[in-house]
């Protein structure tokens, strides 16, 4: 790669070459113009790790804690380090652009991708995202803020019209993007799938050009979300530089014709191409060649950072009687469906093949010096557990053979064209390629051998984007090839799981074969659903057992145990891109299991893994409760570090946890109805709503305990004289002394809130405006400083003036942290002023 003379290159490009540059060539790569030294660039998903170019059978990668977990750290320095490692992982995968971070706003607990965004509050989300992007882009890799804007649900996400006031748009949904840009102007922004107030964002000139480019002064590249381009002229004229993925649906000859007929002017094309060429120059110093090989890092220092991030994200919600930390020398009973499952990431674009994973059970067992026993407690799978890791190949390897043919199984003498060895029995083939496969229609036989450990009836399940028949010892057990029903897996492309059963004997080996046909072999009506390539498959199995049997056994064991910890929650099956949750509840049986174990042993520690809030009807019984999110590669070790006191928890909730779904402010206005969703809660998202209506959530935004105690004192506040025009340069500086009054070293998160004066405008009771994190030894005191610009601390969006308004009056400053202590001060705004810009 070489630095391009952008203006000279634009002059030398033909119209056809310009058109080609504005669309991808495949799922992950941009177009090249070799004669002008313009190379193809590679992009890769990056919500919580850099997957590389393959969903299917890809090169393993580091998996970071999910964004809500990172949001819970409230730690800008950690987010910077995470960003740097993300950049280094991207370089290892030969990718110039990371498609992240996501900074949408969780207006509902049910959003399928809620775990991908940092927080319900724009200040917390935007500041963390800015430091993350700063770390990432300092490696030379381009970051992509997404999804711009109001992509806050999965239901009908390609078509839904988000009806939102401009005030809510500015104060809630655009704010994290605005604040992130103040810290780091990212090289790229990705548009949202949805419409906003009647127009798809990818062709919304007000959002892309007027706000992002003109008002904020941003000059990077705007790309579509994958298949999120819906027009030729409208999108190119609105400011959408790049349609992804390729091959193009809307550009190509259609765009060339539009330019020749003056429906899109060539000077507009030049602007689109200019932004694309500027991106080339941004990433050129990386020296990553076209189609670079994908490598793994997995360095010890990276593992240490991932473990620290996992541990520092764990929120201590309750700790009555100082049950935690646990005693390493005492025996421990581990219970629950998440104990031996590594719930390390959510589903969809966030999913990847991690270098390794550590389950909570493994994390506890590695640190306990006493006996560690296990009880399942309940099964919480949405679909039957993957069978692949329990299979063996005919030559004794873990997993199964994946044999590819162009002809169906009914064809005699068909030719084997590819054979792979796989362990995971879940595969999305969107990026599978082979030179002998010319179309999306082909067939795969997956064959392995299963030896059950227990007698019993075993249930088998098959989910496909395509068709599938599962045989056990040549007996058809599951037929998912006819009368198929659409489900939610694989971005909403897959069928529901079809099941069958067979009685098996312990110790006997059975041959298991899945005959799979790709997506075109299915008779499922897929109108309105984007088909990603040739389809996908998933097959699982489990011994049939009653939940009552499992719960009773767990409760009995708990009644006799000296230390008990439950690991329950959700997984990537329940929280994933492609669909929203129907409710906030844990999977069936989990609440009853937790409640009965707590009755049997009230000192049981409960650990919940989820990316977003869940209901906890047993919370009043639990003395010790942790929220542990999806913790990445090191989730099990990170949780165990907190349980045993190696790490003193300091995390605070980045989301409000309502008592029940009906309490959340978007309850009446979530999901698409007749093609639209009304953002009826307006600016009252999350804590802004609960505080305004004086409705206590189960656990509030910003909540989190510690193994030590802190005090805050000596609050001082300094302002600067007001200028005629309100702009940057009028900082409010808040200084406070923080003391560790306990006996354990630990970190405190100091939160700065501002409460507005009473005016004629309805405003939140208070809003977060700044925060900092400080580590203190027992008895140590440190002064900390939080600085926030007056315009950001005081303003609301005036829809009549179409400007931010900082109104005259007395503003109260509140400083909070761990515990109930609140320090207060105030400052004056002497006259009302208005402003625009970043």
UniProtKB/Swiss-Prot annotation:
Residues linked to a glycan: 197, 493
SMART domains recorded: Fn3_like (SM01217), PA14 (SM00758)
Record-given protein name: Probable beta-glucosidase I
Cited function: Beta-glucosidases are one of a number of cellulolytic enzymes involved in the degradation of cellulosic biomass. Catalyzes the last step releasing glucose from the inhibitory cellobiose.
Pathway in which this enzyme or protein is active: Glycan metabolism; cellulose degradation
Gene Ontology MF, one: beta-glucosidase activity
Catalytic activity: Hydrolysis of terminal, non-reducing beta-D-glucosyl residues with release of beta-D-glucose
Gene3D superfamilies: Galactose-binding domain-like, Glycoside hydrolase family 3 C-terminal domain, Glycoside hydrolase, family 3, N-terminal domain, Immunoglobulins
GO biological process: cellulose catabolic process
Organism: Aspergillus fumigatus (strain CBS 144.89 / FGSC A1163 / CEA10) (Neosartorya fumigata)
Keyword set, alphabetical order: Carbohydrate metabolism, Cellulose degradation, Glycoprotein, Glycosidase, Hydrolase, Polysaccharide degradation, Secreted
Domain PA14: residue ranges: 395-555
